[in-house]
Amino acid sequence: MPNLQTVAQLISLFLILTSGPAIIVLIALRRGNL
């Protein structure tokens, strides 16, 4: 079984990769760049 800290880092990295584009779109919408 892998280390709990390693699992947490993998999950956080996965969340950042999957939610990254959505966050960028939200910031662009707030600034009115779209």
From Swiss-Prot:
Keyword check for DNA damage: no
Main location: plastid
InterPro entries: PSII_Ycf12_core-subunit (IPR010284)
Keywords per UniProt: Chloroplast, Membrane, Photosynthesis, Photosystem II, Plastid, Thylakoid, Transmembrane, Transmembrane helix
Residues that span the membrane, as ranges: 7-27
Pfam family, one: PSII_Ycf12
Signal peptide from the UniProt entry: none
Coiled coil spans: none
BP GO terms, sorted: photosynthesis
Top-level taxonomic group: Eukaryota
Membrane topology: Single-pass membrane protein
Keyword Thylakoid listed: yes
GO cellular component, one term: chloroplast thylakoid membrane
Entry's localization field: Plastid, Chloroplast thylakoid membrane
Functional summary from the UniProt entry: A core subunit of photosystem II (PSII), probably helps stabilize the reaction center.
Similarity comment text for this entry: Belongs to the Psb30/Ycf12 family.
HAMAP family named among the record's database cross-references: PSII_Psb30_Ycf12
Subunit structure: PSII is composed of 1 copy each of membrane proteins PsbA, PsbB, PsbC, PsbD, PsbE, PsbF, PsbH, PsbI, PsbJ, PsbK, PsbL, PsbM, PsbT, PsbX, PsbY, PsbZ, Psb30/Ycf12, peripheral proteins of the oxygen-evolving complex and a large number of cofactors. It forms dimeric complexes.
UniProt-recorded name of the protein: Photosystem II reaction center protein Psb30
Source species: Rhodomonas salina
Classification of source organism: Eukaryota, Cryptophyceae, Pyrenomonadales, Pyrenomonadaceae, Rhodomonas
Name of the gene this protein is made from: psb30
